[in-house]
Protein backbone atom coordinates (compact mmCIF):
# COMPACT_ATOMS: atom_id res chain seq x y z
CA UNK A 1 0.00 0.00 0.00
CA UNK A 2 1.42 3.39 -1.03
CA UNK A 3 1.79 6.24 1.45
CA UNK A 4 -1.15 8.01 -0.21
CA UNK A 5 -3.38 4.96 0.12
CA UNK A 6 -2.36 4.53 3.75
CA UNK A 7 -3.08 8.20 4.45
CA UNK A 8 -6.55 7.95 2.84
CA UNK A 9 -7.34 4.75 4.73
CA UNK A 10 -6.38 6.41 8.03
CA UNK A 11 -8.49 9.45 7.14
CA UNK A 12 -11.49 7.21 6.42
CA UNK A 13 -10.97 5.41 9.74
CA UNK A 14 -10.84 8.75 11.58
CA UNK A 15 -14.06 9.97 9.94
CA UNK A 16 -15.77 6.67 10.70
CA UNK A 17 -14.68 6.72 14.36
CA UNK A 18 -15.72 10.37 14.84
CA UNK A 19 -19.08 9.82 13.13
CA UNK A 20 -19.73 6.86 15.43
CA UNK A 21 -18.93 8.98 18.50
CA UNK A 22 -21.23 11.74 17.22
CA UNK A 23 -24.00 9.15 16.78
CA UNK A 24 -23.45 8.01 20.38
CA UNK A 25 -23.99 11.61 21.52
CA UNK A 26 -27.26 12.06 19.63
CA UNK A 27 -30.43 12.63 21.66
CA UNK A 28 -33.43 11.58 19.55
CA UNK A 29 -37.02 12.89 19.93
CA UNK A 30 -37.92 9.44 21.31
CA UNK A 31 -35.19 9.77 23.94
CA UNK A 32 -36.47 13.26 24.84
CA UNK A 33 -39.98 11.81 25.38
CA UNK A 34 -38.60 8.98 27.51
CA UNK A 35 -36.42 11.31 29.63
CA UNK A 36 -39.20 13.88 30.13
CA UNK A 37 -41.67 11.23 31.32
CA UNK A 38 -39.08 9.79 33.70
CA UNK A 39 -38.17 13.27 35.00
CA UNK A 40 -41.83 13.93 35.90
CA UNK A 41 -41.98 10.52 37.62
CA UNK A 42 -38.86 11.37 39.64
CA UNK A 43 -40.28 14.79 40.59
CA UNK A 44 -43.42 13.14 41.98
CA UNK A 45 -41.28 10.66 43.89
CA UNK A 46 -39.09 13.46 45.28
CA UNK A 47 -42.10 15.46 46.55
CA UNK A 48 -43.35 12.47 48.55
CA UNK A 49 -41.97 11.50 51.98
CA UNK A 50 -38.74 9.47 51.61
CA UNK A 51 -39.02 5.71 51.93
CA UNK A 52 -38.15 4.30 55.32
CA UNK A 53 -34.40 4.07 55.78
CA UNK A 54 -33.74 6.54 52.95
CA UNK A 55 -32.13 9.93 53.44
CA UNK A 56 -31.47 12.76 51.00
CA UNK A 57 -27.79 11.84 51.04
CA UNK A 58 -28.37 8.19 50.14
CA UNK A 59 -31.34 8.55 47.80
CA UNK A 60 -30.60 8.36 44.10
CA UNK A 61 -33.81 10.17 43.10
CA UNK A 62 -34.41 13.90 42.60
CA UNK A 63 -33.97 15.68 45.97
CA UNK A 64 -36.86 18.17 45.34
CA UNK A 65 -35.87 20.31 48.34
CA UNK A 66 -38.50 22.74 49.73
CA UNK A 67 -36.91 26.20 49.80
CA UNK A 68 -39.38 27.59 52.40
CA UNK A 69 -39.95 30.61 50.16
CA UNK A 70 -43.70 30.91 49.63
CA UNK A 71 -44.00 34.06 47.56
CA UNK A 72 -42.27 35.76 44.67
CA UNK A 73 -41.31 39.45 44.48
CA UNK A 74 -43.08 41.78 42.06
CA UNK A 75 -40.48 44.54 41.73
CA UNK A 76 -41.94 46.99 44.27
CA UNK A 77 -39.83 45.81 47.22
CA UNK A 78 -37.41 48.31 48.82
CA UNK A 79 -34.53 48.14 51.29
CA UNK A 80 -30.80 47.59 51.81
CA UNK A 81 -29.79 44.00 52.48
CA UNK A 82 -26.63 41.92 52.53
CA UNK A 83 -26.03 38.84 50.43
CA UNK A 84 -23.20 36.31 50.58
CA UNK A 85 -22.56 33.79 47.82
CA UNK A 86 -20.34 30.73 48.12
CA UNK A 87 -19.84 29.24 44.66
CA UNK A 88 -17.41 26.74 43.19
CA UNK A 89 -14.43 29.07 42.83
CA UNK A 90 -15.31 32.43 44.44
CA UNK A 91 -16.89 33.89 47.55
CA UNK A 92 -18.81 37.11 47.05
CA UNK A 93 -20.33 39.48 49.55
CA UNK A 94 -22.77 42.19 48.40
CA UNK A 95 -24.85 45.03 49.72
CA UNK A 96 -28.03 45.27 47.62
CA UNK A 97 -30.23 48.38 47.50
CA UNK A 98 -33.68 47.49 46.13
CA UNK A 99 -35.24 50.62 44.62
CA UNK A 100 -38.83 49.37 44.39
CA UNK A 101 -39.17 49.89 40.63
CA UNK A 102 -37.77 46.58 39.30
CA UNK A 103 -34.24 48.04 39.61
CA UNK A 104 -31.47 47.75 42.18
CA UNK A 105 -27.92 48.93 42.84
CA UNK A 106 -25.15 46.96 44.45
CA UNK A 107 -21.74 47.16 46.12
CA UNK A 108 -19.79 43.92 46.06
CA UNK A 109 -16.47 42.29 46.84
CA UNK A 110 -15.37 39.03 45.25
CA UNK A 111 -12.60 36.79 46.61
CA UNK A 112 -11.08 33.69 45.08
CA UNK A 113 -11.35 30.68 47.35
CA UNK A 114 -7.76 29.67 48.26
CA UNK A 115 -6.65 26.40 46.67
CA UNK A 116 -5.77 24.85 50.03
CA UNK A 117 -9.42 25.15 51.12
CA UNK A 118 -10.46 23.29 47.98
CA UNK A 119 -7.80 20.60 47.72
CA UNK A 120 -6.76 19.74 51.27
CA UNK A 121 -8.86 16.99 52.84
CA UNK A 122 -7.66 18.02 56.33
CA UNK A 123 -9.36 21.43 56.12
CA UNK A 124 -12.12 21.92 58.72
CA UNK A 125 -15.45 23.77 58.67
CA UNK A 126 -13.89 26.43 60.91
CA UNK A 127 -11.17 27.03 58.31
CA UNK A 128 -13.70 27.55 55.53
CA UNK A 129 -16.29 29.62 57.42
CA UNK A 130 -13.52 31.57 59.17
CA UNK A 131 -12.30 32.60 55.70
CA UNK A 132 -15.86 33.63 54.70
CA UNK A 133 -16.23 35.72 57.88
CA UNK A 134 -12.86 37.45 57.34
CA UNK A 135 -13.89 38.43 53.81
CA UNK A 136 -17.24 39.67 55.16
CA UNK A 137 -15.36 41.80 57.71
CA UNK A 138 -13.19 43.30 54.93
CA UNK A 139 -16.38 44.16 53.02
CA UNK A 140 -18.03 45.78 56.04
CA UNK A 141 -14.91 47.88 56.73
CA UNK A 142 -15.05 49.19 53.16
CA UNK A 143 -18.79 49.70 52.62
CA UNK A 144 -20.47 49.81 56.06
CA UNK A 145 -17.79 51.14 58.47
CA UNK A 146 -20.34 53.10 60.56
CA UNK A 147 -22.45 50.02 61.30
CA UNK A 148 -19.31 48.06 62.13
CA UNK A 149 -18.12 50.75 64.57
CA UNK A 150 -21.41 50.57 66.51
CA UNK A 151 -20.80 46.89 67.31
CA UNK A 152 -23.60 45.44 69.44
CA UNK A 153 -25.53 48.73 69.27
CA UNK A 154 -25.78 48.58 65.48
CA UNK A 155 -29.14 47.99 63.85
CA UNK A 156 -29.42 44.32 62.74
CA UNK A 157 -28.48 43.81 59.09
CA UNK A 158 -30.24 40.93 57.36
CA UNK A 159 -28.08 38.67 55.20
CA UNK A 160 -29.21 36.09 52.65
CA UNK A 161 -26.68 33.28 52.17
CA UNK A 162 -26.48 31.67 48.74
CA UNK A 163 -24.99 28.23 49.26
CA UNK A 164 -24.86 26.35 45.98
CA UNK A 165 -24.50 22.82 47.29
CA UNK A 166 -27.16 20.24 48.20
CA UNK A 167 -28.55 20.89 51.68
CA UNK A 168 -31.37 19.31 53.65
CA UNK A 169 -33.24 22.52 54.37
CA UNK A 170 -35.62 22.44 57.34
CA UNK A 171 -36.58 26.14 57.47
CA UNK A 172 -35.69 29.36 55.66
CA UNK A 173 -32.65 29.90 57.89
CA UNK A 174 -31.30 26.41 58.50
CA UNK A 175 -30.00 23.59 56.37
CA UNK A 176 -27.47 20.79 56.76
CA UNK A 177 -25.00 19.94 54.03
CA UNK A 178 -25.85 16.67 52.23
CA UNK A 179 -22.66 16.43 50.19
CA UNK A 180 -20.13 18.63 48.41
CA UNK A 181 -20.30 18.63 44.61
CA UNK A 182 -17.96 21.13 42.93
CA UNK A 183 -14.50 21.46 44.42
CA UNK A 184 -14.66 21.17 48.21
CA UNK A 185 -13.81 17.99 50.14
CA UNK A 186 -14.27 19.19 53.73
CA UNK A 187 -15.64 16.05 55.38
CA UNK A 188 -16.58 17.54 58.74
CA UNK A 189 -19.06 20.02 57.20
CA UNK A 190 -21.32 17.23 55.92
CA UNK A 191 -24.36 16.92 58.20
CA UNK A 192 -23.81 20.34 59.84
CA UNK A 193 -26.01 23.45 59.63
CA UNK A 194 -24.16 25.82 57.29
CA UNK A 195 -26.09 28.89 58.51
CA UNK A 196 -25.01 28.20 62.09
CA UNK A 197 -21.38 27.68 61.03
CA UNK A 198 -21.31 31.04 59.19
CA UNK A 199 -23.21 32.91 61.95
CA UNK A 200 -20.83 31.65 64.65
CA UNK A 201 -17.79 32.87 62.70
CA UNK A 202 -19.42 36.27 61.98
CA UNK A 203 -20.10 36.77 65.71
CA UNK A 204 -16.61 35.55 66.65
CA UNK A 205 -15.09 38.17 64.34
CA UNK A 206 -17.01 41.13 65.74
CA UNK A 207 -20.07 41.29 63.47
CA UNK A 208 -23.02 40.44 65.76
CA UNK A 209 -25.19 42.93 63.86
CA UNK A 210 -25.19 40.66 60.79
CA UNK A 211 -28.00 38.13 61.01
CA UNK A 212 -27.99 35.25 58.52
CA UNK A 213 -31.77 35.05 58.10
CA UNK A 214 -32.14 33.13 54.84
CA UNK A 215 -30.39 30.20 53.23
CA UNK A 216 -30.93 29.90 49.52
CA UNK A 217 -29.08 28.65 46.49
CA UNK A 218 -28.11 30.30 43.23
CA UNK A 219 -31.07 28.76 41.40
CA UNK A 220 -33.73 30.00 43.81
CA UNK A 221 -31.92 33.35 43.73
CA UNK A 222 -32.05 33.39 39.92
CA UNK A 223 -35.80 32.82 40.03
CA UNK A 224 -36.42 35.56 42.63
CA UNK A 225 -34.12 38.00 40.85
CA UNK A 226 -35.92 37.39 37.56
CA UNK A 227 -39.31 37.91 39.25
CA UNK A 228 -38.08 41.22 40.74
CA UNK A 229 -36.66 42.63 37.50
CA UNK A 230 -39.34 41.25 35.14
CA UNK A 231 -42.05 43.72 34.19
CA UNK A 232 -44.41 40.76 33.76
CA UNK A 233 -44.31 39.44 37.32
CA UNK A 234 -47.74 40.84 38.09
CA UNK A 235 -49.09 39.57 34.79
CA UNK A 236 -52.32 38.33 36.40
CA UNK A 237 -53.29 41.90 37.25
CA UNK A 238 -51.35 43.89 34.68
CA UNK A 239 -52.82 42.15 31.66
CA UNK A 240 -49.41 41.00 30.44
CA UNK A 241 -49.46 37.49 29.08
CA UNK A 242 -46.27 35.88 30.37
CA UNK A 243 -45.06 35.17 33.88
CA UNK A 244 -41.90 33.70 35.44
CA UNK A 245 -42.32 29.99 36.23
CA UNK A 246 -38.81 28.48 36.40
CA UNK A 247 -35.38 29.65 37.54
CA UNK A 248 -32.47 27.70 36.10
CA UNK A 249 -28.70 27.67 35.85
CA UNK A 250 -26.62 26.31 33.01
CA UNK A 251 -23.06 27.30 33.85
CA UNK A 252 -20.24 25.54 35.71
CA UNK A 253 -23.04 23.39 37.17
CA UNK A 254 -26.74 23.09 36.40
CA UNK A 255 -29.89 23.19 38.52
CA UNK A 256 -33.40 24.58 38.57
CA UNK A 257 -36.34 25.57 40.77
CA UNK A 258 -40.03 26.29 40.32
CA UNK A 259 -43.19 27.09 42.30
CA UNK A 260 -45.09 23.98 43.44
CA UNK A 261 -48.51 23.75 45.10
CA UNK A 262 -47.97 23.25 48.84
CA UNK A 263 -50.66 20.53 48.86
CA UNK A 264 -48.52 18.45 46.52
CA UNK A 265 -45.34 18.69 48.65
CA UNK A 266 -46.37 15.75 50.81
CA UNK A 267 -42.84 15.36 52.22
CA UNK A 268 -43.62 18.48 54.31
CA UNK A 269 -45.39 17.60 57.59
CA UNK A 270 -49.19 17.85 57.28
CA UNK A 271 -49.39 20.38 60.14
CA UNK A 272 -46.90 22.69 58.39
CA UNK A 273 -48.84 22.46 55.12
CA UNK A 274 -52.10 23.22 56.94
CA UNK A 275 -50.49 26.17 58.76
CA UNK A 276 -49.12 27.68 55.52
CA UNK A 277 -52.41 27.25 53.67
CA UNK A 278 -54.26 28.84 56.62
CA UNK A 279 -51.92 31.83 56.25
CA UNK A 280 -53.02 32.11 52.62
CA UNK A 281 -49.85 30.62 51.17
CA UNK A 282 -50.58 28.20 48.35
CA UNK A 283 -47.19 27.64 46.68
CA UNK A 284 -43.58 27.09 47.70
CA UNK A 285 -40.38 27.18 45.68
CA UNK A 286 -38.90 23.72 45.15
CA UNK A 287 -35.16 23.45 44.55
CA UNK A 288 -35.09 20.46 42.19
CA UNK A 289 -31.32 19.73 42.36
CA UNK A 290 -31.65 18.29 38.87
CA UNK A 291 -27.92 17.74 38.51
CA UNK A 292 -28.76 14.45 40.28
CA UNK A 293 -31.39 13.37 37.74
CA UNK A 294 -31.17 9.65 36.92
CA UNK A 295 -28.08 8.85 38.96
CA UNK A 296 -29.08 5.21 38.44
CA UNK A 297 -28.59 5.67 34.67
CA UNK A 298 -31.88 4.04 33.76
CA UNK A 299 -32.48 6.43 30.86
CA UNK A 300 -29.65 8.98 30.50
CA UNK A 301 -27.57 8.49 27.34
CA UNK A 302 -24.14 7.25 28.41
CA UNK A 303 -20.89 6.86 26.49
CA UNK A 304 -17.66 5.27 27.67
CA UNK A 305 -16.26 8.80 28.11
CA UNK A 306 -19.04 9.69 30.58
CA UNK A 307 -18.19 6.58 32.60
CA UNK A 308 -14.47 7.44 32.79
CA UNK A 309 -15.15 11.06 33.79
CA UNK A 310 -17.61 10.01 36.50
CA UNK A 311 -15.75 7.03 37.94
CA UNK A 312 -12.11 8.03 37.58
CA UNK A 313 -11.93 11.82 37.34
CA UNK A 314 -14.78 13.37 39.32
CA UNK A 315 -14.83 14.06 43.07
CA UNK A 316 -18.33 12.53 43.48
CA UNK A 317 -18.58 9.29 41.46
CA UNK A 318 -22.14 8.04 41.00
CA UNK A 319 -23.72 11.42 41.73
CA UNK A 320 -24.73 14.42 39.61
CA UNK A 321 -24.68 12.33 36.44
CA UNK A 322 -27.08 14.65 34.60
CA UNK A 323 -24.82 17.60 35.45
CA UNK A 324 -21.79 15.70 34.13
CA UNK A 325 -23.44 15.54 30.69
CA UNK A 326 -24.80 19.09 30.60
CA UNK A 327 -22.74 21.61 32.57
CA UNK A 328 -19.86 23.77 31.42
CA UNK A 329 -17.46 22.17 33.89
CA UNK A 330 -17.62 18.88 31.97
CA UNK A 331 -18.02 19.80 28.26
CA UNK A 332 -14.30 20.38 27.74
CA UNK A 333 -13.43 17.29 29.77
CA UNK A 334 -15.59 15.11 27.50
CA UNK A 335 -13.73 16.43 24.43
CA UNK A 336 -10.34 15.99 26.10
CA UNK A 337 -11.10 12.34 26.88
CA UNK A 338 -12.25 11.69 23.31
CA UNK A 339 -9.06 13.23 21.85
CA UNK A 340 -6.83 11.14 24.13
CA UNK A 341 -8.81 8.01 23.20
CA UNK A 342 -8.62 8.68 19.44
CA UNK A 343 -4.87 9.22 19.82
CA UNK A 344 -4.51 5.87 21.60
CA UNK A 345 -6.34 4.21 18.68
CA UNK A 346 -3.79 5.65 16.26
CA UNK A 347 -6.36 7.92 14.59
CA UNK A 348 -5.56 11.51 15.69
CA UNK A 349 -2.48 13.52 16.70
CA UNK A 350 -0.12 10.86 15.40
CA UNK A 351 2.89 13.18 15.55
CA UNK A 352 3.00 12.01 19.19
CA UNK A 353 4.23 8.40 19.35
CA UNK A 354 2.89 7.65 22.84
CA UNK A 355 0.51 9.07 25.44
CA UNK A 356 3.53 10.21 27.48
CA UNK A 357 4.60 12.46 24.59
CA UNK A 358 1.23 14.23 24.32
CA UNK A 359 1.19 17.85 25.58
CA UNK A 360 0.79 17.86 29.36
CA UNK A 361 -2.31 20.07 29.15
CA UNK A 362 -4.06 17.43 27.02
CA UNK A 363 -3.38 14.65 29.52
CA UNK A 364 -4.36 16.73 32.57
CA UNK A 365 -8.03 16.41 33.61
CA UNK A 366 -10.19 19.55 33.44
CA UNK A 367 -7.59 21.61 31.59
CA UNK A 368 -9.85 22.20 28.58
CA UNK A 369 -12.50 24.83 29.31
CA UNK A 370 -15.89 25.14 27.65
CA UNK A 371 -14.77 28.59 26.46
CA UNK A 372 -12.35 26.87 24.05
CA UNK A 373 -15.21 24.73 22.76
CA UNK A 374 -17.30 27.85 22.17
CA UNK A 375 -14.58 29.24 19.84
CA UNK A 376 -14.39 25.94 17.94
CA UNK A 377 -18.21 25.67 17.74
CA UNK A 378 -18.62 28.77 15.56
CA UNK A 379 -15.31 28.74 13.70
CA UNK A 380 -15.93 29.25 9.98
CA UNK A 381 -12.45 30.55 9.13
CA UNK A 382 -10.44 29.06 6.27
CA UNK A 383 -8.75 25.86 7.42
CA UNK A 384 -10.41 26.43 10.82
CA UNK A 385 -7.56 28.74 11.82
CA UNK A 386 -9.47 29.98 14.90
CA UNK A 387 -9.70 26.41 16.13
CA UNK A 388 -5.99 25.94 15.49
CA UNK A 389 -5.13 29.00 17.59
CA UNK A 390 -7.54 28.04 20.40
CA UNK A 391 -6.04 24.55 20.71
CA UNK A 392 -2.50 25.93 20.60
CA UNK A 393 -3.23 28.52 23.29
CA UNK A 394 -5.20 26.25 25.62
CA UNK A 395 -3.50 22.87 25.19
CA UNK A 396 -0.24 23.68 23.34
CA UNK A 397 -1.68 21.28 20.77
CA UNK A 398 -0.78 21.63 17.07
CA UNK A 399 -3.38 20.15 14.67
CA UNK A 400 -3.82 19.59 10.94
CA UNK A 401 -6.77 21.09 9.00
CA UNK A 402 -8.25 17.57 8.61
CA UNK A 403 -8.02 16.93 12.36
CA UNK A 404 -9.66 20.27 13.10
CA UNK A 405 -12.68 19.40 10.94
CA UNK A 406 -13.19 16.24 13.00
CA UNK A 407 -12.61 18.05 16.30
CA UNK A 408 -15.26 20.62 15.37
CA UNK A 409 -17.73 17.80 14.61
CA UNK A 410 -17.06 16.38 18.07
CA UNK A 411 -17.49 19.76 19.77
CA UNK A 412 -20.84 20.29 18.07
CA UNK A 413 -22.05 16.81 19.06
CA UNK A 414 -21.05 17.39 22.71
CA UNK A 415 -22.73 20.81 22.93
CA UNK A 416 -25.88 19.63 21.13
CA UNK A 417 -26.27 16.74 23.57
CA UNK A 418 -25.84 19.18 26.46
CA UNK A 419 -28.49 21.59 25.11
CA UNK A 420 -30.96 18.81 24.25
CA UNK A 421 -30.63 17.26 27.71
CA UNK A 422 -31.00 20.76 29.23
CA UNK A 423 -34.48 20.95 27.66
CA UNK A 424 -35.69 17.86 29.55
CA UNK A 425 -36.19 19.39 33.04
CA UNK A 426 -37.74 22.53 31.55
CA UNK A 427 -40.27 20.54 29.49
CA UNK A 428 -40.99 18.25 32.47
CA UNK A 429 -41.71 21.13 34.88
CA UNK A 430 -43.91 22.97 32.36
CA UNK A 431 -45.92 19.79 31.76
CA UNK A 432 -46.16 18.79 35.44
CA UNK A 433 -47.33 22.25 36.57
CA UNK A 434 -49.60 22.66 33.52
CA UNK A 435 -48.02 26.12 33.19
CA UNK A 436 -48.88 26.57 29.51
CA UNK A 437 -52.61 25.97 30.01
CA UNK A 438 -53.32 27.99 33.12
CA UNK A 439 -54.98 30.84 31.26
CA UNK A 440 -55.54 32.39 27.86
CA UNK A 441 -52.30 32.50 25.80
CA UNK A 442 -50.44 30.81 28.68
CA UNK A 443 -47.02 32.23 27.82
CA UNK A 444 -44.27 31.71 30.37
CA UNK A 445 -40.84 33.07 31.20
CA UNK A 446 -37.86 31.02 32.31
CA UNK A 447 -35.17 32.99 34.14
CA UNK A 448 -31.76 31.59 33.15
CA UNK A 449 -28.29 32.29 34.50
CA UNK A 450 -24.87 30.78 33.86
CA UNK A 451 -22.06 31.13 31.36
CA UNK A 452 -23.21 28.29 29.08
CA UNK A 453 -26.77 29.50 28.52
CA UNK A 454 -25.65 33.13 28.28
CA UNK A 455 -22.49 32.89 26.19
CA UNK A 456 -22.14 29.47 24.51
CA UNK A 457 -22.90 30.04 20.80
CA UNK A 458 -26.19 28.51 19.73
CA UNK A 459 -26.94 26.88 23.10
CA UNK A 460 -30.29 28.61 23.56
CA UNK A 461 -31.31 27.90 19.95
CA UNK A 462 -30.47 24.20 20.35
CA UNK A 463 -32.32 24.10 23.68
CA UNK A 464 -35.40 25.66 22.06
CA UNK A 465 -35.20 23.17 19.19
CA UNK A 466 -35.15 20.34 21.73
CA UNK A 467 -38.19 21.82 23.54
CA UNK A 468 -40.06 21.74 20.21
CA UNK A 469 -39.05 18.08 19.72
CA UNK A 470 -40.01 17.21 23.32
CA UNK A 471 -43.57 16.37 24.46
CA UNK A 472 -44.22 20.16 24.65
CA UNK A 473 -44.20 20.24 20.85
CA UNK A 474 -43.60 23.22 18.57
CA UNK A 475 -46.75 24.99 19.77
CA UNK A 476 -45.69 24.72 23.41
CA UNK A 477 -42.13 25.82 22.65
CA UNK A 478 -43.41 29.04 21.06
CA UNK A 479 -45.03 30.02 24.38
CA UNK A 480 -41.74 29.77 26.27
CA UNK A 481 -39.54 32.85 26.70
CA UNK A 482 -35.97 32.19 27.86
CA UNK A 483 -34.72 35.30 29.67
CA UNK A 484 -31.25 35.90 31.07
CA UNK A 485 -31.63 36.68 34.79
CA UNK A 486 -28.74 38.80 35.97
CA UNK A 487 -27.00 38.17 39.26
CA UNK A 488 -29.43 35.79 40.90
CA UNK A 489 -27.04 34.80 43.66
CA UNK A 490 -26.67 38.40 44.89
CA UNK A 491 -30.07 40.04 44.38
CA UNK A 492 -31.95 36.77 44.84
CA UNK A 493 -30.33 36.12 48.23
CA UNK A 494 -31.14 39.70 49.29
CA UNK A 495 -34.78 39.18 48.25
CA UNK A 496 -34.80 35.97 50.27
CA UNK A 497 -33.51 37.88 53.32
CA UNK A 498 -36.23 40.47 52.79
CA UNK A 499 -39.04 37.93 53.13
CA UNK A 500 -37.44 36.32 56.22
Swiss-Prot record:
Q: Which residues carry this modification: Phosphoserine?
A: 2, 470
Cite the residue spans of the region called Hexokinase large subdomain: 217-487
Q: What's the EC number here?
A: 2.7.1.2
Q: Which reaction does it catalyse?
A: D-glucose + ATP = D-glucose 6-phosphate + ADP + H(+)
Annotated residues that bind ATP are located at 110, 487-492
UniProt region (Hexokinase small subdomain), positions on chain = 74-216
Question: Could you say which enzyme class this protein belongs to?
Answer: transferase
- What are the GO cellular component annotations? cytosol; mitochondrion; plasma membrane
Source organism, top-level taxon: Eukaryota
InterPro entries from the entry? Answer: ATPase_NBD, Hexokinase, Hexokinase_BS, Hexokinase_C, Hexokinase_N
PROSITE patterns xref list: HEXOKINASE_1, HEXOKINASE_2
Residues covered by the Hexokinase domain: 12-498
Where is the PTM N-acetylserine found along the chain? 2
- One GO-annotated biological process of the protein: glucose metabolic process
Q: Which SUPFAM superfamilies match?
A: Actin-like ATPase domain (SSF53067)
Please name the pathway: Carbohydrate metabolism; hexose metabolism; Carbohydrate degradation; glycolysis; D-glyceraldehyde 3-phosphate and glycerone phosphate from D-glucose: step 1/4
Q: Give the family per the record.
A: Belongs to the hexokinase family.
PANTHER family given in the database record? GLUCOKINASE-1-RELATED, HEXOKINASE
Physiological role: Two isoenzymes, hexokinase-1 and hexokinase-2, can phosphorylate keto- and aldohexoses in yeast, whereas a third isoenzyme, GLK, is specific for aldohexoses. All glucose phosphorylating enzymes are involved in glucose uptake.
Subunit info here reads: Monomer.
**Additional facts recorded:** Present with 21100 molecules/cell in log phase SD medium.
This one is known as: Glucokinase-1
Lineage, highest ranks first: Eukaryota, Fungi, Dikarya, Ascomycota, Saccharomycotina
Amino acid sequence: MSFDDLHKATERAVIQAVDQICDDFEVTPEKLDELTAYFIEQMEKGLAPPKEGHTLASDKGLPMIPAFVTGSPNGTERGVLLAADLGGTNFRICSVNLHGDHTFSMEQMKSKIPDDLLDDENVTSDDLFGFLARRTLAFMKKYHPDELAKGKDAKPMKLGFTFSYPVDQTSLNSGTLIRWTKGFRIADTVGKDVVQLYQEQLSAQGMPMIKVVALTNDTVGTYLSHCYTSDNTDSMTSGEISEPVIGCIFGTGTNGCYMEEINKITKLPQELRDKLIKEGKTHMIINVEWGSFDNELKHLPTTKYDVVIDQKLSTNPGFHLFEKRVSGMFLGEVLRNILVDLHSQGLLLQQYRSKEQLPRHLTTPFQLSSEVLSHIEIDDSTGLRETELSLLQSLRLPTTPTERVQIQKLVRAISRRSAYLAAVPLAAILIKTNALNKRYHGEVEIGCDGSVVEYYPGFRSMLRHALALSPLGAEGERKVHLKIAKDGSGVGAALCALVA
